[in-house]
Regions:
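Pyridoxal 5′-phosphate
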Residues: 1-380
């Protein structure tokens, strides 16, 4: 819990971070002033070693070769790199009906600028039905399936292993959006991902402005950004060496060093323990509110990561979130940057209020939140 303008804020979004993350960020600003991979002086060498260590951490966590881990600005950046790097001109790709705009918008843009066709697969009542819906959309032109591992709106899990097997059987690239799942599920390239994209600031507990593009090395990406890499600098052609090829320009050394401590936190605590803790809090909130008729939960009965999305009658979700903010709770209202998902849920006009606890959330905070929601529901 933190204080803003002397008021306590119980945050159920992307804060707080482990103390070691904040300490690492401060130390990075003070001690690691060099540009990694750009010079031979001690400052540059020291920060290069630090960045390499974090890259190794991420590679070990997700079962990748170290050179196949690229640092990005966020998950959106990583997804754009993967999608646009695979789908250059023409062809067909498939996405799910639970995608974030980080997937939907690049795909839509490619349909307007590169002649890429796309289809949206409907999620079914069962995993097998969902996979079958994807399978039916595959054509001889299909090059890629891009699917979230877990919805950022409701937490619903997609059958990612089965979709990976489907892609492999048809020789199709599989790109996964792991932003809402990495750090909560023990995801690995061994699950069948060709590209796993994720954010550093969510369940990996790193700073904002950090992300990861993790590859199994089967597909070579064309670049969407070219520039200085510190490698083959005498050539105008972008370096072919990884990860430098995908990391043009000065990278976010401060954020990456902080991310390293976030990865350490997750590894030591374990995704399973973190997930179990958050699931208990979601169950607690659901049980405390489920007897109120005017409160509607979305996909609460599905296999999912620990998220609850709800509405109160026909009240705009932004109004509910604003009220909760005034009472000291930070929950996300609106569309959560996921118009495709809200179209699927039938909430494109109202949005939803999203409860997304963390490893630092407590049962006492959830009880206080549920009481506040009950008061609002009773008076509106």
């Amino acid at each position: 819990m933190r204080k803003i303008n002397t008021r306590s804020i119980i945050n159920f979004d992307t804060y707080p971070k482990p103390p070691a993350v904040a300490k690492a960020v401060a130390q990075a600003v003070e001690r690691y002033g060099g540009n990694p991979g750009r010079s031979g002086h001690k400052l540059s060498m020291r920060v290069s070693e630090k960045i390499f260590t974090v890259r190794q951490q991420a590679a070990k966590m997700f079962g990748a070769q170290t050179e196949n881990v690229a640092f990005t600005a966020n998950c959106t950046h990583a997804l754009n790199m993967a999608i646009k790097g695979v789908m250059q001109y023409g062809g067909h790709m498939i996405i799910s009906d639970h995608e974030h705009n980080a997937v939907a918008r690049p795909v839509y843009a490619l349909s307007k600028t590169r002649g890429v066709k796309y289809s949206i697969a409907r999620t079914g009542e069962t995993d097998s039905e969902t996979v079958e819906n994807f399978r039916r959309l595959i054509t001889p032109e299909t090059k890629c399936i891009c699917c979230t591992v877990a919805s950022n709106v409701t937490g619903r899990l997609m059958p990612y292993r089965e979709l990976a097997a489907l892609c492999k059987a048809h020789g199709i690239c599989f790109i996964a959006d792991g932003a809402q799942a990495c750090g909560l599920l023990k995801l690995s390239l061994s699950d069948g991902f060709n590209f796993l994209c994720t954010a550093g600031h969510k369940a990996l507990y790193g700073p904002t402005g950090t992300g990861l593009l993790i590859s199994d090395g089967e597909y070579s990406l064309s670049t969407i950004i070219e520039g200085g890499t510190g490698a083959t600098s005498a050539l105008l052609e972008q370096t072919p060496f990884l990860p430098e090829k995908l990391e043009s320009g000065t990278i976010n050394t401060v954020g990456i060093i902080g991310l390293g401590e976030g990865l350490t936190f997750v590894r030591q605590k374990t995704p399973a323990v973190i997930k179990a803790h958050e699931e208990k809090l979601c169950k607690q909130l659901y049980e405390q509110l489920s007897d109120i008729d005017k409160i509607k939960f979305y996909e609460a009965d599905q296999k999912k990561v620990p998220i609850l999305s709800f509405n109160i009658g026909d009240i705009p979700s932004a109004e509910i979130a604003s009220y909760l903010s005034e009472k000291g709770f930070a929950l996300r209202g609106g569309l959560q940057c996921a118009a495709v998902t809200h179209t699927t849920l039938g909430t494109i006009e109202q949005g939803t209020v999203r409860f997304s606890p963390s490893a630092f959330s407590t049962p006492q905070q959830v009880t206080a939140l549920s009481r506040t929601i009950k008061i609002f529901a009773a008076n509106n």
